[in-house]
Amino acid sequence: MKTVVVDTNVLIRFLAGEERYRHAFDAYGRILVPAVVIGEFKCGTDGKTAKGRQQKKALETFLAKACVELIPMGEKESDWYAEVFRVLKRQGTPVPQNDMWIAATALSHGAPLLSDDAHFGQMPMLRLV
């Protein structure tokens, strides 16, 4: 079964109904969502407006799918986070901390990352789709 980790920007576009992302998700039998992605998503919606309630419901529906798994930050992810940090520091290429956690989740699960953020390309050990 093909597995992919999703970044926040992709999740937002998928939940907004963008066709390109719906087809991208159809290619995978297992979709991993790092906890930090959910946190970032929730920062962008308050759940109090009609649009916010719709976004919250869309997220809940998505997370309830059998192929979707919410991934907490654990020891494996922490080890990979430290490695990503060291590599980026040596390269002199800073990346937002949350994105290092997202990359660490993909690396700890041996899965590629689906993202539109170009700075993930600065991580040579990370596979992107």
Each PLM stretch: what is its role?
Residues C43, E69-P112:
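Active-site neighborhoods of divalent-metal-dependent phosphate/nucleic-acid chemistry enzymes
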Residues M1-V37, C43-T61:
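Short, well-structured N-terminal submotif of metal-dependent ribonuclease cores
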